[in-house]
Structure formats: structure tokens, C-alpha cells
Amino acid sequence: MAKTLYEKLFDSHIVYEAEGETPILYINRHLIHEVTSPQAFDGLRVANRQVRQVNKTFGTMDHSISTQVRDVNKLEGQAKIQVLELDKNTKATGIKLFDITTKEQGIVHVMGPEQGLTLPGMTIVCGDSHTATHGAFGALAFGIGTSEVEHVLATQTLKQARAKSMKIEVRGKVASGITAKDIILAIIGKTTMAGGTGHVVEFCGEAIQDLSMEGRMTVCNMAIEMGAKAGLIAPDETTFAYLKDRPHAPKGKDWEDAVAYWKTLKSDDDAQFDTVVTLEAKDIAPQVTWGTNPGQVISVNETIPNPQEMADPVQRASAEKALHYIGLEAGTNLKDIKVDQVFIGSCTNSRIEDLRAAAAVMKGRKKADNVKRILVVPGSGLVKEQAEKEGLDKIFIAAGAEWRNPGCSMCLGMNDDRLGEWERCASTSNRNFEGRQGRNGRTHLVSPAMAAAAGVFGKFVDIRDVTLN
């Protein structure tokens, strides 16, 4: 029987399945961080349980840490408690932790692939909604809640219902200047933020295959923003080249055997998908969100839609509420919108490729007078090290940007990087919800190049009109 890639991954990890019951899956890799793990470890202690397979769980510090200092003792309040708890819990159980004193530390969804912990064919979970990032490698990866974190620590398994399969094909090649971020925002704009609900999405097509692994991670990272359980891209030579010689990747004969298996991880030609969506790559322009969910997005050269022209009453009400919060009116040209801050970072766009794209725009230019701050936050210590080796940090600093240490930073208002009230931000992160970047902050999601351009021109511009240095 023909199967989709998702079906192959799911079926190969079933530990137990019975009629009328939710299947139990084996979990190959468990990633943890300081925010969603403390209660899980507390639960283990109360029940007098041990971590079942210590060598399959890895931790990092990312969400609540400061990107300005590397000293735990200088953290305050809840952030300090969370970081110290993670350190205590990993030491007590023997779990490997990449803490803020090591260059391997980073945002969990940057650190995992970078270390070769993310491999094709795996099941990967983490107490974080953007775990779908790892699906870029042909792994079944999804976010879980704190009680499930405890369950995986205790059993290395998880109850998981079968999802539907969706195929999203992006045909042909994108135009110059169009990035993975534009592709995924255009997809969400077409499907809406609920279009993938109940599905695991496989992204395919020439435009997807042309992406680097960094770009593929950006696409899968935001699968959750269209309501999907997970996102997948079948592994290929690009995947294998990225993984070869990574610290935790197989070596020698094991590598050869692994690649031979990984090459089988693709949907069968006659596999049936529950839902199929198609986009033409040539039609995708630079994207900018105008509202308060990632599905409220248009091309930079378009005007903000009129809610009164929307047939769906729910969509209309959502748009009206979004425009009121975001402080914009229907018919406004996106290129007339000025920004107060710029954030380049997050698990969506903080890898070396993203920083290179931003630096190419900012080189030889200065922060616009109306822009209060440009934050550039690498996704890991290794990304930071590579960027500094290439001199990217000097480009950012010369332009008037702040070059920070690794962390989630202004993606979410959980640390000391936040927007002021009603400030408008061009952000490379993945969510533009109300208050996401700080109380009453206004977020517009864009690619790294578009964010950098907004920082030096003071407003949104079409990156295709910008000369790169």
C-alpha cells in the first residue's frame, strides 16, 4: 500500500496500537529548555520515577535568558529560577545541557540541527510549539505540553493520534530576492492560520528543493502557524551534506547505512494526501503581515485589505479587530508604514544564512533616525562565532544595530528584550499576536533582508528595489 512520508514515519514508530485506542509512539529525541521542563521534573520526583533514556534527551537555555549578559547571577526573578532549575535537574539526572557558558548553547531549534541531534526518520519532541522546525530533515517533529514532557522523560514514548496528510507544492522557481520566509508567509496567507488544522504538512516542489537547510527550517518552523501538527520535507543530498560530520551524526559505516535508509524517506508516487495545495513560485513577492496573526499577510507592494469586502464574517471581524490593534487603516500602502524597532533573530531566522542576508542590506548604511533600535540576535554560540569570523557583527554595529548573545530574545516578551507600548516592529520571528513582543507591541513579520531594509530606510520597502552591498 502506497504511503506518504508522514505515514511511513508514524507507522515505523508505533510501540502499541489497539482498536479504539490512541497509538503509542516511540520518541527518538527529546529536547528540553528552561520554561516547560521544571514542572515535568517535579512530577518525576513526586512519582519517584527516573528518566528512562538519559542519552536521548538534551537541554539548552534560550527562552528567558538575557541576550545582554552571560551570567546566570545577573538574571532576575522567574528567569533566574527557571535557568537554575534546568541546571539542577539536568545535573541530577545526567541529561546533557548546553548552558550559557558554552558556545554550543542556543535556541533549541537551532542547536538541535547544528549538533546533528536532528536526523531524518526520527520522532522528535520538545515542549515548544515550533518543534516542527526539525521536520525540515524528514523527521516527525512536534511540540508537546509539560505533562507530555514528563511522560516522555519517564517512558520515552507518547500517545499520539494519527493526523491527516497535506501536500503543499510550490511549483517552479522564486524570483530573485524571494526567501524561504516569503514562501511560508505566502503559503499561510493562502491557507489561512487554520488551513492546516488536523494535518501534518509535507512541503515539496522545485522552490522547496532549491532551499538550503536553513531555508527549509524556516518553512517547517512556521507550519504550526497554519494550524498544522507538523511540517515535513523529504531528505535529499542537501540534507545529507548539512548533517555530515555534525557532532552527533553517524560516522563511518554507520553514516553510509544511515544515508541508505534516509534515501527511502519520501512519499510514494501514488500516495494519497487528504488535502493538496499548490502555489506558483513566480507569483510570490516579499511578504509583510499587516494584522495580528501570520495569515493576515500580503505582498509589500499591496495595500491593506478592507474588512468590509471580506465575505466570511469571522474573517471580517478578525481583520477589524487586528487593524484596530495594529493602528492601521484599510487601503494603507505597506511601503508607507514606518517602524520603531527591528528584530532579526528567533528560531525562524537566526541562522548564518539569515544574518548574511541582513548584513548584505545593512552594509554601508546607517540605522534610520526614526528607528529606535535594531536588535540582531544569533541563534546559537556557533552562529555567533561564524558571523564574527565573517565580520558580520562589525557590519551590524557600524550600521547602528545591537549585536547580542544567543537566545530567543524579542520573539516573545519573556525576557528583557521587549517592545515599548504601541511600538511597531519589523520582525523575523514567527508570531505577530497581540502583545507577543511586549505589552501592546505591534509586530510585522518579514524576512531578514526585509527587516534589515526597514531598519535602514525607516519603513517597509521592496527588497527587490534595494542595492545589496
Curated annotation (Swiss-Prot):
Cofactor: binding details: Binds 1 [4Fe-4S] cluster per subunit.
Disulfide links within the chain: none
InterPro entries membership: 3-IsopropMal_deHydase_lsu, Acnase/IPM_dHydase_lsu_aba_1/3, Acoase/IPM_deHydtase_lsu_aba, Aconitase_4Fe-4S_BS, Aconitase_4Fe-4S_dom, IPM_dehydratase_rel_enz, IPMI_cat
GO biological-process terms attached to the record: L-leucine biosynthetic process
One Pfam family of this chain: Aconitase
Highest rank taxon of the organism: Bacteria
Record-level Gene Ontology MF annotations: 3-isopropylmalate dehydratase activity; 4 iron, 4 sulfur cluster binding; metal ion binding
Quaternary structure (record): Heterodimer of LeuC and LeuD.
Name of the molecule in the record: 3-isopropylmalate dehydratase large subunit
Annotated source species: Haemophilus influenzae (strain ATCC 51907 / DSM 11121 / KW20 / Rd)
Gene name in the database record: leuC
